[in-house]
């Protein structure tokens, strides 16, 4: 299988490179793509050094079977046709196509069958907070239909990418020296702070991040679930956490819920 990673130098791209190697993904050939800033960089993969190519509108994706794209919504929209025109399956990590009717939004533990219907050769990856929530919700949905969800998220600096993590680190260093921290990636200073403001506010006074959880959850689960989210940025480098309140049509006992969660792949029940 010929595999490509677009955005290979970003935080997600570098992590994906590690995961493909750790899980022995069947990639006979791997191509890395990036912007002018990252083109020419070299990364190790299975004992080889692979250089980053400049992403351009050409035929570099000819023969590629799967392209993992994590370079932002603008790049995904601009290069989708270039990536897929020779038959490559584009798995997109951005918000560019998530709500398009002809693009499946897939979490493998929840709706893998949706991936089989991808007429544009694009599969969208949901927002990070949506993914971890729907895996848990799906276990409960199998017991009783979920009516509504209230969720509070606590999201690390990694959600803002490598630049976000770097800014948090710089802020801690500046404050330790009595200096003024630089604030660019976040709405406010993140170090020693909590920011209930991720992305821009929409007309209904929820942030765009919060509305992603509403719309994406309903699409993934093919459900009319009502979702109210409060998304908070917290001053840690990695790991998101969520506190979720769920109302179901029939009462579910704690024992039923524990058994349901225990049966879900890639989850660890602590109860």
Label every model-predicted segment:
Residues 6, 11-15, 26-28, 38, ...:
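Active-site-lining helix/loop region of Rossmann-like oxidoreductase modules
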Residues 81-89, 93-119:
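Rossmann-fold NAD(P)-binding glycine/threonine-rich loop
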């Amino acid at each position: 299988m010929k595999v490509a990673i677009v955005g290979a130098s970003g935080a997600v791209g570098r992590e994906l490179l590690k995961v493909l190697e750790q899980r022995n993904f069947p990639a006979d050939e791997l191509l890395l793509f990036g912007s002018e800033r990252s083109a020419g960089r070299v990364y190790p993969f299975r004992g080889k050094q692979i250089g980053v190519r400049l992403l351009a509108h050409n035929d570099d994706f000819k023969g590629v079977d799967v392209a993992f794209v994590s370079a932002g919504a603008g790049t995904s929209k601009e290069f989708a046709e270039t990536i897929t025109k020779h038959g490559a399956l584009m798995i997109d990590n951005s918000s560019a196509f998530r709500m398009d009717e002809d693009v499946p939004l897939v979490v493998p533990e929840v709706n893998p069958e949706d991936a089989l219907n991808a007429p544009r050769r694009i599969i969208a990856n949901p927002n990070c907070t949506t993914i971890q929530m729907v895996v848990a919700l799906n276990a409960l949905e199998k017991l009783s239909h979920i009516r509504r969800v209230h969720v509070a998220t606590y999201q690390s600096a990694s959600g803002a990418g490598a630049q976000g993590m770097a800014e948090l680190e710089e802020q801690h260093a500046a404050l330790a020296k009595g200096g003024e921290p630089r604030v660019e990636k976040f709405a406010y200073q993140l170090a020693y702070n909590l920011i209930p403001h991720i992305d821009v506010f929409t007309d209904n006074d929820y942030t765009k991040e919060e509305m992603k959880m509403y719309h994406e959850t309903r699409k993934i689960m093919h459900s009319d679930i009502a979702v109210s989210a409060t998304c908070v940025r917290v001053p840690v480098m990695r790991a998101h956490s969520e506190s979720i309140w769920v109302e179901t049509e029939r009462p579910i006992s704690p024992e039923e819920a524990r058994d349901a969660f225990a049966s879900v792949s890639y989850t660890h029940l602590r109860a």
